[in-house]
Amino acid sequence: MNDNLARVEYQRNELLNGRLVMMSPRPTYNHNRIASNIFRTFDNYLAGKNCTAIADGTDLYLTEKDRLVPDMMIVCDRNKIKYNGVHGAPDLLVEVLSPGTYKNDRGYKKDLYSKCGVHEYWLVEPASCTLEQYLLENGQLEIAEIYHLYPDYMLADMDEKELAEVVTEFKCSLYDDLLIKLEDIFANLI
């Protein structure tokens, strides 16, 4: 290998309120696994339906000053899908939290998604196996539920009452007949 050859890497970035923001270093295995698991769940469910699941890497254009790259999105209005990305608010957006994007995902992006009319927004925390589900209410994305996949050792220490309160699956607000299992979202992590 020639040491004089420079390694060129694609730099992932977003445009937030007109400001170019470099995204975290390349996503971790767990980050990608979670995004893939969520995408696969929706992609399988939506086969043959009007809405489509769109994986990480697709640009999302919401305003003249905002170009984002969410980890996964659902778009039901196919007119919003163009050759270079999605133009307009998706119906569901998913962000898997990373140290470098955490603040923007919870702050500016959540506010922007509210203003643009995103119906549902998920924030997923890989380290704690937690999913926050936000729903649009009166023009604001409000926390609806927080779901947590408990490890076996914690479940073993719970009494019957605590175990009865543990949620292992939930529904997306867009689809009454789709039951999403937390163990599927957080499957095969290291």
What are these regions (language model features)?
Residues 1-190:
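Gly/Pro/Ser/Thr-rich low-complexity, intrinsically disordered segments predominantly at protein N-termini
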